[in-house]
């Protein structure tokens, strides 16, 4: 038998039988790529730094660090070989330090020594195979993802989910809807807007799709997550989080595994974090252990306002903070918080007193209940270095709710406390002032139990709903007209010494929900769920008429604008401008009188539509304005001019006849203006235009006229 004949024989069964374990003898070695390139004189210094860095996960053998050098250049090659005491330590090093930032300019790639040989063999195999150029997908232009902001009339959009149909429509006056897009079976369950309105998300059995642009087609991108149920965006739209109630299962077929972006470490996980730029998963998480009878809290992963950090808690145990750039645990360890119940990020970066004015921080707050002899605690923490800014110890605590002011300047923790007999409860409001030195705390003690509290956007005023029936053994909904609605304002004229004072409290109000306008000032109170109430109450905190309620020194003039009705209301949402508000009755809640209504901020009905199997309404969010403070001021000063333009547009939309007449007048005026400009130019060229006289050539003529205003005759005797 010749050598050529031997080449045709299949030895795969023998190779498999006598295969050598590549890890045997090398299991405790790792190879580090991306280390700093140094001259030979700095070898000892780099070895010491590497030993300290990699020694965090296990003991490195004596002389267990080898740094190879290039003889031609006399410098290191950027590789480092490290030997640990055990293979488990080496495996931990790969898991902890792969793709880890070593310093500002160096990111490390860490692999086992045996894996390097395996990848080299795969490369040699690929070299012998014929190269097949991968198919390049044709570029499809999506159009500008914020094209709706260029609408000449500055209108907002909203999405309607009716039966199996989903459509995006313009908010306009009139009876007919103007659709931007309207499609059958666009989603299998729900649709979601991203925080700034860039994307509309549709959910499907195989995953989610993101839509946008002027044409709404094709989908911008797809994310594969079977049986996805919940979707969440980070505030800056850098990350997308999906959750499925079914753990992730990898296919058995090797070819199918290559088509999905998941590996063995992701199997069994239910939460996936996606990078919207790369469209790849950055990390997967398992669900935290569930307590019996406890419902799932969403979102599970919460992001800082700048998308720099993300945090999640293991209920009752710890709080884990991650750096989103690598999705690695900050400082490689979690914050131990025995009994932790809830946490919330400040909605904006906070400028802490005593720090540089330009330096802003991501701050979060969490609370733990009373456990044994340990008091309940509210903790304020700076995320970057886990510095505790303020701790507040509390006693006899039944529950806490965290309420951040939207600019992060104030934090209110609503503390429900029980009496010593534990038969009734009352509420304390604990106010933290983050922009003052030491984060002082102000306590407002109330006799009633506060059921809801809401800060005014961009302001320091707030509103509470409370009730005097504070028995702890009553779980049902309160009877109608048992709530007290209270308005509070801060004494601004006293500066940092000012406290929050009551403006006015209204008893026997039938409401459980508070909805502030996005721009503040206007408020709607309503009863949602658990009641047949149909009333919406509209309030103005800065009424321009006479003051009726509250201290004259408080920065508020409260006025009740009126009530409106919507039977079976299940949700309410303001539009981004704060001029309109939508209420709707969802088929998902009940099956009677489904539909939606749109009101203006004063409670005047603008549009009403009853729709069978109506499911959801949602305004399209807008990104933060790019206008400067001066530009905003100029717009406010010229509101009358803008109002005339919009009134003209409204008149044109009122009827086709009015539209044609206004357009004709506008065209004739433009033609006359153009003719007049052309004529003046010709006269000027011919020298027939008399120059305007200088100011000194003007003659001032004064005329004195006597006018008889009244003629009276008096008879003197």
From Swiss-Prot:
Keywords: Coiled coil, Cytoplasm, Initiation factor, Protein biosynthesis, Repeat, RNA-binding, WD repeat. Belongs to the eIF-3 subunit B family. PROSITE patterns: RRM. InterPro entries: EIF3B, eIF3B_RRM, Nucleotide-bd_a/b_plait_sf, RBD_domain_sf, RRM_dom, TIF_beta_prop-like, WD40/YVTN_repeat-like_dom_sf. This is Eukaryotic translation initiation factor 3 subunit B. RNA-binding component of the eukaryotic translation initiation factor 3 (eIF-3) complex, which is involved in protein synthesis of a specialized repertoire of mRNAs and, together with other initiation factors, stimulates binding of mRNA and methionyl-tRNAi to the 40S ribosome. The eIF-3 complex specifically targets and initiates translation of a subset of mRNAs involved in cell proliferation. Component of the eukaryotic translation initiation factor 3 (eIF-3) complex. It comes from the Eukaryota. One of its GO terms (cellular component) is eukaryotic 43S preinitiation complex. The keyword Coiled coil applies. It is found in: Cytoplasm. Residues 28-115 form the RRM domain. Residues 1-89 are annotated as: Sufficient for interaction with HCR1 and TIF32. It holds the Pfam family eIF2A. WD repeats lie at residues 183-221, 223-284, 293-332, 445-484, 506-549, 564-609. One of its GO terms (biological process) is formation of cytoplasmic translation initiation complex. GO terms for molecular function: identical protein binding; RNA binding; translation initiation factor activity; translation initiation factor binding. Residues 1-216 are annotated as: Sufficient for interaction with PIC8. PANTHER family: EUKARYOTIC TRANSLATION INITIATION FACTOR 3 EIF3 -RELATED, EUKARYOTIC TRANSLATION INITIATION FACTOR 3 SUBUNIT B. It comes from Yarrowia lipolytica (strain CLIB 122 / E 150) (Yeast).
